Amino acid sequence: MSTLGHQYDNSLVSNAFGFLRLPMNFQPYDSDADWVITGVPFDMATSGRAGGRHGPAAIRQVSTNLAWEHNRFPWNFDMRERLNVVDCGDLVYAFGDAREMSEKLQAHAEKLLAAGKRMLSFGGDHFVTLPLLRAHAKHFGKMALVHFDAHTDTYANGCEFDHGTMFYTAPKEGLIDPNHSVQIGIRTEFDKDNGFTVLDACQVNDRSVDDVIAQVKQIVGDMPVYLTFDIDCLDPAFAPGTGTPVIGGLTSDRAIKLVRGLKDLNIVGMDVVEVAPAYDQSEITALAAATLALEMLYIQAAKKSE
């Protein structure tokens, strides 16, 4: 059982092995880790198909197939030789208590950041990003958001716990600056007056990767960046295992290239969310999420000398 909490561990097998077969450390705060992976098995804020609470386990399980590559293509180095990454297992909270989950996740994140660690988190539904943003903003101040998704999640429906409202709430709390934030892959209805730059899926699919990345860098500038990737940004052909799939999304190839292009940004926190393995086929959604998470670590490792 993870020592991040004391209730019954509802994560099933998630705490049995680490992402990419990395070492498990249930007390990461005093470790020498650079980056700490945390699973958040929560899907109570889902409006579509539930099941995202099993996402962390699915991502970890399929990631074992990625662990063998030491000089990863096209990086040609081993991230593990440049970054000290540990997996602290899943957040434990009273199952069914969304408020407790939010408070415990924020407290866990604040403690890690105060200890000089950085976080890569696995959802869970996308609501888990909000307590993570609250913790990161306390440590880094107002941030830019780089957000991959089929939905803007800026919907003002008055619900406190909803995976479609985080980026309506976050600017109002002063956590992120919409004028320096960008949402990539959007292909559903959204409010055009909320300050975010929206790069919809049609234009992202039609433009070159280099062109999109250049615009993202111009928008973000030198602000600290929180990177969040909702797996439904990908087309359902590449990621069927999610709660709210939307046709017309990005290919996995384009998404990976876009993430790689973010390596020069000042990224201070990252997450991958909304994997729901019950709807997956041959683990392709979990594999896409695990690969994107690995690429996120590689863009951090690329900043470090050998």
Curated annotation (Swiss-Prot):
Its cofactor is Mn(2+). Pathway: Amine and polyamine biosynthesis; putrescine biosynthesis via agmatine pathway; putrescine from agmatine: step 1/1. Its EC number is 3.5.3.11. It holds the Pfam family Arginase. PROSITE patterns: ARGINASE_1, ARGINASE_2. It is an enzyme of class 3 (hydrolase). One of its GO terms (biological process) is spermidine biosynthetic process. Mn(2+) binds at residues 126, 149, 151, 153, 230, 232. InterPro entries: Agmatinase (IPR023694), Agmatinase-rel (IPR005925), Ureohydrolase (IPR006035), Ureohydrolase_dom_sf (IPR023696), Ureohydrolase_Mn_BS (IPR020855). It comes from the Bacteria. Keywords: Hydrolase, Manganese, Metal-binding, Polyamine biosynthesis, Putrescine biosynthesis, Spermidine biosynthesis. This is Agmatinase. It comes from Shigella dysenteriae serotype 1 (strain Sd197). The lineage of its organism: Bacteria, Pseudomonadati, Pseudomonadota, Gammaproteobacteria, Enterobacterales. The gene is speB.
